[in-house]
Amino acid sequence: MTLKIGIVGSGGRMGRQLIQAVYHTEGVELGAAFERVGSSLVGTDAGELAGIGRIGIKVTDNLTQEKGNFDILIDFTRPEGTIQHLAFCVEQHKNIVIGTTGFDDQSKQAIQQAAQNIAIVFASNYSVGVNLVFKLLEKAAKVMGDYCDIEIIEAHHRHKVDAPSGTALSMGEHIAKTLGRDLKTHGVFSREGITGERKPDEIGFSTIRAADVVGEHTVWFADIGERVEISHKASSRMTFANGAVRAAKWLSTKQEGLFDMTDVLDLNNL
């Protein structure tokens, strides 16, 4: 049975890549494509929007009207929009893949609560490589973390609105959890002026925003005389789109619960 996928934010950079990924993936098809109310893209053929040619599915701004045309929703938009789409999915009992970042604690709690009724994959990054890096960071932190300085450097395009990136924060959380630290108290997100010496248990973050950088993350485990760097560089958003579609296929057999790409890729059994 073919899984029908709905994509919100279909006119955005990720939305167009998601349409392409769905089009080129066996076992799935695009069921509906959505944009915000008032968007000039409403009425446009979704395939033409994504550069794959006409596919006969028009972009719409009404999820309710299209509810019978898709089984699962993929959302890479903004936090306020995602929470609205999440409420719709709970009401209609449709599963959702969330790639949006920048949620506050209240919104994260709403996602956790929704997962009692539907199945959700919520991840900061859908790249297979990045999620493998998460596991490598845990292993590096276990061996080196208590004896070195840890710094996370991330770079993205000039249009990204949140900082540090959700992926950088997830990297910090994986490291902090491994070391038994609380990232909220041990994370350092800016340094300016006379800051004093670096504390040994800090996890530092540095952010770069420039041009069209898709996404780059490097973590330093720096000791006196040597430094280990673990890096991931994305050259195309298609890696995130393919991962999200893979997550949607995996999620289609679930009834409820909150999952991430560690579950999708079965990384805990490595």
Curated annotation (Swiss-Prot):
The active site is at H156 (proton donor/acceptor), K160 (proton donor). Its EC number is 1.17.1.8. It is found in: Cytoplasm. It is an enzyme of class 1 (oxidoreductase). One of its GO terms (cellular component) is cytosol. One of its GO terms (molecular function) is 4-hydroxy-tetrahydrodipicolinate reductase. (S)-2,3,4,5-tetrahydrodipicolinate binds at H157, G166, T167. The keyword 4Fe-4S does not apply. It catalyses: (S)-2,3,4,5-tetrahydrodipicolinate + NAD(+) + H2O = (2S,4S)-4-hydroxy-2,3,4,5-tetrahydrodipicolinate + NADH + H(+); (S)-2,3,4,5-tetrahydrodipicolinate + NADP(+) + H2O = (2S,4S)-4-hydroxy-2,3,4,5-tetrahydrodipicolinate + NADPH + H(+). It holds the Pfam family DapB_C. Keywords: Amino-acid biosynthesis, Cytoplasm, Diaminopimelate biosynthesis, Lysine biosynthesis, NAD, NADP, Oxidoreductase. Its main location: cytoplasm. NADP(+) binds at R36. Belongs to the DapB family. Catalyzes the conversion of 4-hydroxy-tetrahydrodipicolinate (HTPA) to tetrahydrodipicolinate. PANTHER family: 4-HYDROXY-TETRAHYDRODIPICOLINATE REDUCTASE 1, CHLOROPLASTIC-RELATED, DIHYDRODIPICOLINATE REDUCTASE. This is 4-hydroxy-tetrahydrodipicolinate reductase. It comes from Histophilus somni (strain 2336). The gene is dapB.
